Amino acid sequence: MKFTCTKNNFNNGINIALKAVPGKTTMPILECVVIEAQEESIKMTTNDMQLGIETRIPAEVQEEGIILVNAKMIAEIVRRLPDEDVNFEVDENNNILLFCGKSKFNIPGINHEEFPMLPQIDIEKKIAISQFTLKEMIRQTIFSISDNESNKILTGELFEINGDEFKIASLDLVRVSIRKIQLKESYDHIKVVIPGKTLNEISKILTGGMEDEVT
């Protein structure tokens, strides 16, 4: 496995991936990020078993491959690198060799096979709205989720699509918040509850741009 990318792109990608790395866990493997070199991009995957993140950055891939490494450690190393290209290599013993300018690091990697990868998503069933709209819908409703862990379903928000209507709702048995928008197309009825913690992290990742879409 071998690739080259800019320090800025690597730093941005790993910082997004860190949002799904648990602060404390009895499963050390969840403290890691899967780094996979594919064609002209690098895919980074993290999963704390409640929130999973998969993000991609552009790169020049000389040799495809996949490796697992402690996420916070690699993030801290990349953060301190000079603003130059990062050269990332993995040898046959899963050792990571990272070069950037005059800096050189030898980092222990891990076989990725035991990492809980994210499930495959049926991309045929999707809607697309602006990141600004979704960010605002979350902001306008998330304050009324419950913090009572004994009633888990109230600690999340209901996402419901019915025809051409998209609705987000939350309640804590005192307050109720509902936000609706009209979609450009009609879809089958579907609803799901998403944890408030997950939505907070998603909201931080969204740029909030009107031209940027999220699906």
Describe each region flagged by the PLM.
Residues 1-215:
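Structural preference for solvent-exposed beta-strand-turn elements
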